[in-house]
């Protein structure tokens, strides 16, 4: 009697990532489920449980797949990679497409683990590498910088509102607006028209001249004092406190962003990217784009990179009809869109 044993060449692990509880399942290359979907916590105990489940299999045959889900997946990705597992990070769009083709449009964490495994089987994948780990760290740094910039922009809007209440004429006094060094230096110390009008012309002249490196002098000081005397702003000392403290927050954020820029530029010194050769794109812009895209080599064709960045045109065609004008695709990442816009403006 002859016995035939099926040789398993690949073992797939699908992990559905969430904030507190992850789900994982294991299947062989024929689709047979070796380990049914199970939950494990996003902590040391949970990670040990995952390792215990995976220790039952030959590590050389294991391929782990999980979706790129932002901050919730980063620590698990780093843990698995540093533990020596082969790893593939999947675009969530791929699993979403597979879900649409299913007869039952069920979406649960357990079902998603099997969809991730199926995605590994039917779609091309690329193994996670040290270069990807470097780009992941870069992305974290750049996104933090982007958040600081958003906070600064929000504070600037608030500051303009406060100034418009107490000294509405001040907003148009400087051609460059209120968000300049001379304006900040003045408003931090004297944020009401009454205080500015009471200053000696020489004192105001010295303050403005020093903050503007000589750009504003006596004529500017006299004109500003005259404007302050006739201001129709509200007399509210508490808003003056808000103005001074808001400027302090803006200046702190500006210094933090400057420090982050230095850290990003230092990190880019070890990354050899063709983006650095593009005129007008500096180290920070290049780092932010690379942090979102990752290793450009993972895109086999330029059109795939364009699609990932949301720069591919949508196509409307039916029968012999083809639309003459179409919109750009809206499928892309918000963070990447922001950096694309920034690069276009350079």
Please describe what each predicted stretch is.
Residues 1-337, 342:
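A detector of single, family-specific signature residues
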């Amino acid at each position: 009697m002859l016995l035939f044993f099926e040789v398993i060449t690949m073992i797939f692990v699908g992990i559905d990532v969430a904030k507190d509880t992850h789900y994982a399942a294991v299947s062989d290359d024929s689709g047979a489920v070796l380990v049914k979907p199970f939950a494990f916590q996003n902590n040391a105990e949970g990670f040990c449980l995952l390792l215990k489940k995976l220790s039952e299999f030959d590590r050389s045959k294991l391929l782990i797949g999980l979706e790129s889900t932002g901050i919730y997946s980063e620590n698990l990705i780093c843990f698995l990679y540093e533990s020596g597992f082969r790893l593939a990070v999947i675009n969530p769009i791929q699993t979403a497409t597979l879900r649409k083709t299913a007869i039952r449009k069920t979406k649960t964490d357990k079902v998603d683990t099997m969809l991730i495994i199926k995605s590994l089987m039917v779609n091309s994948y690329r193994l996670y590498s040290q270069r990807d780990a470097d780009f992941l760290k870069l992305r974290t740094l750049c996104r933090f910088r982007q958040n600081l910039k958003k906070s600064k922009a929000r504070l600037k809007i608030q500051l303009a509102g406060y100034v418009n209440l107490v000294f509405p004429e001040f907003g148009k006094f400087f051609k460059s607006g209120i968000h300049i060094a001379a304006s900040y230096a003045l408003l931090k110390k004297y944020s009401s028209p009454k205080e500015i009008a009471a200053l000696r012309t020489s004192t105001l002249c010295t303050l403005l001249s020093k903050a503007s490196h000589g750009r504003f002098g006596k004529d500017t000081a006299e004109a500003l004092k005259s404007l302050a005397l006739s201001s129709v702003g509200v007399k509210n000392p508490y808003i003056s406190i808000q103005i001074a403290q808001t400027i302090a927050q803006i200046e702190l954020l500006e210094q933090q962003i400057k420090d982050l820029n230095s850290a990003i530029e230092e990190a880019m010194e070890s990354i050899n990217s063709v983006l650095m050769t593009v005129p007008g794109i500096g180290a920070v812009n290049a780092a932010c784009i690379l942090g979102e895209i990752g290793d450009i080599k993972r895109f086999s064709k330029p059109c795939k990179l364009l699609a990932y960045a949301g720069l591919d045109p949508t196509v409307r065609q039916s029968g012999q009809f083809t639309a003459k004008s179409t919109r750009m695709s809206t499928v892309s990442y918000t963070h990447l869109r922001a950096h694309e816009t920034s690069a276009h403006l350079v």
